[in-house]
Amino acid sequence: CNKFHFKGINGDFNEIIPKIEPKDLVIICTPVHLLLLAAQKSIDHGQTNILIEKPGSLYKKELNLFLKNITTQRIRIGYNRFCYPAFHKLLNICKKDEKILSCHFTFTEWIHTINFSNNLSDTYARWGISNSLHVISMAFGLIGLPKTISSYQSGMLDWHPSGSIFTGSGITENNIPFSYHANWKSSGRWGIEIMTTENSYRLIPLEKLRVCSKG
């Protein structure tokens, strides 16, 4: 805090937030199960521009209830990888110059790096929403949301009983075919590959854009 001239305040956000005067921006970065509670407390005490750490909530019902309480406030959920220059460069290319023909993406997780002490168990049991949605949302941000999709999963992990291997394919609302794969028991990484009329593009890692031209 001292390095960036911030004043640190320790304690329960239920007690601290009411004491904070309205700011230009409030960033909510708590364990997942507390995100909306802290955001609502901020709204109740006059904050109007709030950035909430992803995923906001693990449950659609909670997000919909929270949405009903928003009037004039500006509320965003922070999927920061949408701000990568590489993503916007590829998006611009595909909008202006080249038509997307198909897409493949991977969301294999480095589970050996996960800190299992930061959140409640349902955060890890819904890890696709908690974390993998970063790359999934980027892919669909490029090609559009699924119109039809076939999904398959197998295996399990102690903390993620619904599966450890995920595959699927479908067609988006823009009529672009896509496929995906993830294996949380093996090696790999996040990545997106876009095939256009002229080139194939890879966001692997997501921060960098690589191109493979025809011929």
What are these regions (language model features)?
Residues 115-189:
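Rossmann-like dinucleotide-binding domain that binds NAD(P)(H)
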